């Protein structure tokens, strides 16, 4: 395994902020250097141990999807090599895991698209017959494919806080009906096209989330990450079965361990600090991320 990067320390550029996984540095007034670390968050809590290669896998996966889907919506890419904007001694921190992007005005709505009933969506449906306020037919089962993908937005929370599911009406109220409809329609189109491609690779994309910003002309632009194992639930099609929790190529593996772990006989309350992950869980999770990259894109880690 390669060495892991838990936190970057690039002193040649002003640090703007550290998110759960990514760290942003200013490159002039109109660009950012976005570094994807090997940190992992689960249940909106940042875990204390890095997952080796995870950041590089996510960066390569995003790059693959940005190139594949840019005909649908502009992306934040600039094409500038990250090594070109840092000092030579800092190049190892950015190589393969960073991207120089346009500085956008972020839209504080997580654009979640669900094509299958899974995770919190399944729990919501069991309790209410709806997912995030979207009424669904009765009698659906866990992991069942929905007749059409649904848009279930969330309000973006601060680091350490839980994202809050909100209705489409609330999105319209916050950002206006025209932009809300554009984000919904673009998100569903991105999901459908990515799902169709993933199906040819033997992967089901159960759900995913996108983030958008506006450029200086007010143009909607895809930003942050796209269809990675962090922002999506990937299932191998060959072992998919309705009524079960399909095995997945994402951090669900860690989530399941955290759900099962007991601390002094009690479940972990899903607040910081997170329990220490065993070495085998870290290794298996790193393998899952690498496998997702290869299965989906046909590429190996660069």
Curated annotation (Swiss-Prot):
Gene3D superfamilies in the record = ATP-grasp fold, B domain, Phosphorylase Kinase, domain 1
> Which Pfam families does the record cross-reference, listed alphabetically?
SAICAR_synt (PF01259)
Pathway annotation: Purine metabolism; IMP biosynthesis via de novo pathway; 5-amino-1-(5-phospho-D-ribosyl)imidazole-4-carboxamide from 5-amino-1-(5-phospho-D-ribosyl)imidazole-4-carboxylate: step 1/2
Q: Do you know which SUPFAM superfamilies this protein is assigned to?
A: SAICAR synthase-like
Any GO BP annotation: 'de novo' IMP biosynthetic process
Keyword list (alphabetical) reads: ATP-binding, Ligase, Nucleotide-binding, Purine biosynthesis
User: Can the keyword Ligase be found in this entry's annotation?
Assistant: yes
Kindly state which reaction or reactions the protein catalyses.
5-amino-1-(5-phospho-D-ribosyl)imidazole-4-carboxylate + L-aspartate + ATP = (2S)-2-[5-amino-1-(5-phospho-beta-D-ribosyl)imidazole-4-carboxamido]succinate + ADP + phosphate + 2 H(+)
List, alphabetically, the InterPro entries matched.
Answer: SAICAR_synt/ADE2_N (IPR028923), SAICAR_synth (IPR001636), SAICAR_synthetase_CS (IPR018236)
Q: What are its E.C. numbers?
A: 6.3.2.6
Transmembrane helix among keywords: no
Q: In the UniProt record, which is one GO cellular component term?
A: cytoplasm
Output the Gene Ontology terms for molecular function. ATP binding; phosphoribosylaminoimidazolesuccinocarboxamide synthase activity
Q: Spell out the family assignment given in the record's similarity comment.
A: Belongs to the SAICAR synthetase family.
Q: What is this protein called?
A: Phosphoribosylaminoimidazole-succinocarboxamide synthase
Q: Where does this protein come from, organism-wise?
A: Ralstonia nicotianae (strain ATCC BAA-1114 / GMI1000)
Organism classification, top ranks? Bacteria, Pseudomonadati, Pseudomonadota, Betaproteobacteria, Burkholderiales
């Amino acid at each position: 395994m390669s060495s892991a990067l838990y936190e970057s320390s690039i002193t040649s550029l002003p640090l703007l902020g550290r998110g759960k996984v990514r760290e942003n540095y200013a490159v002039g007034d109109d660009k950012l250097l976005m570094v994807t670390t090997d940190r992992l968050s689960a249940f909106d809590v940042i875990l204390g141990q890095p997952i080796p290669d995870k950041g590089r896998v996510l960066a390569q996966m995003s790059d693959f999807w940005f190139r594949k889907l840019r005909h649908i919506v502009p992306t934040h890419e600039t094409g500038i090599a990250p090594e070109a904007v840092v000092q030579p001694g800092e190049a190892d921190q950015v190589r393969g895991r960073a991207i120089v992007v346009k500085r956008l005005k972020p839209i504080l709505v997580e654009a979640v698209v669900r094509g299958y009933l899974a995770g919190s969506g399944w729990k919501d449906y069991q309790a209410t017959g709806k997912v995030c306020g979207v009424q669904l037919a009765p009698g659906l089962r866990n992991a069942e494919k929905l007749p059409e993908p649904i848009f279930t937005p969330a309000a973006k929370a601060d680091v350490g806080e839980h994202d809050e599911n909100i209705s489409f009406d609330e999105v319209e109220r916050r950002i206006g009906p025209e932009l809300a409809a554009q984000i919904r329609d673009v998100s569903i189109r991105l999901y459908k096209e990515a799902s169709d491609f993933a199906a040819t690779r033997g992967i089901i994309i159960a759900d995913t989330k996108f983030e958008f910003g506006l450029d200086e002309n007010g143009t909607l632009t895809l930003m942050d990450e796209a269809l990675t194992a962090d922002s999506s639930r990937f299932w191998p099609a060959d072992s998919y079965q309705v009524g079960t929790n399909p095995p997945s190529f994402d951090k669900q593996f860690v989530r399941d361990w955290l759900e099962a772990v007991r601390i002094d006989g009690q479940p972990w309350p899903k607040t910081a600090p997170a329990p220490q992950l065993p070495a085998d869980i870290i290794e298996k999770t790193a393998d899952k991320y690498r496998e997702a990259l290869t299965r989906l894109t046909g590429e190996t880690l660069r």
